């Protein structure tokens, strides 16, 4: 079947790059009409983007896992924004194609490999610096399903290592363990009557 690509946002159309996604989808379908289906939540009307209604998080996670191969995030804003929707899609096993105007990939020490494709925008953040490169990335996944599957697993593994329950809960478990099995006298946050 066709490559399944998705973009989602509920914010400002321009800041989130929804217009860029519509342009990308239209350019892809012009070149390879049968190679991909493009889903969009919050995307401007486009003849090639299948609109999807916003859904609750559990339903969205299930949708990503069952219906999406590549998640596209085209943030223009920069500082103050991360990849929350991209991280959710990666946790579901989707390959991520994203802008990184805030430098999240390197600044936070992620430095993902080729299974997270960083998309460059022009200096004014109005358009893609090289839309042909983005189209080639997507077409590569449409024609090489083995690579798509490998990159989806790597993206999911990386996402769980960074944002999965074990990674998020580890500091809490360490704190609780130090309270239950202290090597030194318990600090105020561990004391039995600390909240009285």
Outline where the language-model segments fall.
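A charged, aromatic-enriched C-terminal amphipathic alpha-helix characteristic of glycosyltransferases
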Residues: 146-177
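A short alpha->beta transition loop at the rim of the catalytic pocket in nucleotide-sugar-dependent
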Residues: 69, 91-94
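Short alpha-helical segment that forms part of, or immediately flanks, the ligand-binding pocket
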Residues: 61-62, 84-91, 105-106
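Short hydrophobic beta-strand element within catalytic cores of glycosyltransferases
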Residues: 95-98, 105
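Conserved catalytic-core segment of nucleotide-activated headgroup transferases in glycan assembly
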Residues: 1-55
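Conserved active-site histidine-acidic residue motif and adjacent donor-binding/catalytic loop
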Residues: 42-68, 76-82, 102
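Conserved donor-binding loops in enzymes that form glycosidic bonds
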Residues: 7-13, 75-76, 121-124
């Amino acid at each position: 079947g066709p490559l399944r690509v998705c973009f989602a946002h509920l914010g400002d159309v321009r800041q989130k790059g929804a217009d860029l996604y519509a342009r990308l989808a239209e350019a892809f379908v012009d070149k390879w009409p049968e190679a991909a289906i493009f889903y969009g939540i919050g995307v401007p009307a486009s003849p090639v983007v299948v609109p999807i209604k916003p859904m609750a998080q559990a339903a969205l996670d299930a949708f990503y896992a069952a219906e999406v191969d590549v998640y596209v995030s085209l943030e223009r804003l920069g500082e103050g924004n991360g990849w929350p929707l991209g991280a959710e899609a990666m946790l579901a096993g989707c390959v991520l194609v994203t802008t990184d105007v805030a430098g999240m990939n390197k600044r936070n020490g992620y430095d993902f490999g080729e299974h997270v494709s960083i998309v460059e925008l022009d200096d004014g953040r109005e358009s893609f610096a090289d839309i042909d490169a983005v189209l080639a990335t997507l077409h590569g996944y449409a024609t090489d399903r083995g690579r798509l599957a490998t990159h989806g697993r790597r993206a999911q593994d990386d996402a769980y290592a960074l944002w999965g329950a074990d990674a998020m809960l580890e500091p809490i478990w360490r704190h609780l363990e130090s309270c239950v099995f202290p090597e030194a006298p318990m600090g105020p946050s561990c004391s039995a009557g600390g909240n009285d």
